[in-house]
Amino acid sequence: MKILVIADVEAKYYYDYYIPGKLDEFELILACGDLKKRYLEFIATMAHCPVLYVRGNHDDCLLVDPPGGCVCIENQIYEYKGIRILGLGGSYRYRSGKNMYTEKQMKNRIHRISYLLWKKKGIDILLTHAPAFGLNDMDGISHRGFECFFYLLE
């Protein structure tokens, strides 16, 4: 299965310079957060496959006005063609606001869905905005990863 993963930056290749059919090769599109509503709606309109997303730390507006044609999978396991995808958006808390979590809060989110994880017999893909701690995270607390993701992936 060919999956397109997008996050943070709107790729001009798929938007400003779009040519009809450019998204036809993908069977699934995963959006990892911090993408504008209009961009997600454009992708969903042009693609002939599901567009699943989680929110990033700059996506407060998507809580009240979600992008049409897309499926938010926050705290859910979405199954597509036998592939189980868990969505856990947000970043490490660095200020007050929505879609930001401490390590403890993210652990609690995982704990709240532990029955679902057991019932579905695990997951195949973890869709997040933040990385796991130490895996492609960056300096600065806003780009820090979550250690609890390792527990989840075991």
Q: PLM features: what roles do these ranges have?
A:
Residues 30, 52-54:
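A short beta-strand/loop micro-motif in the catalytic core of glycosyltransferases
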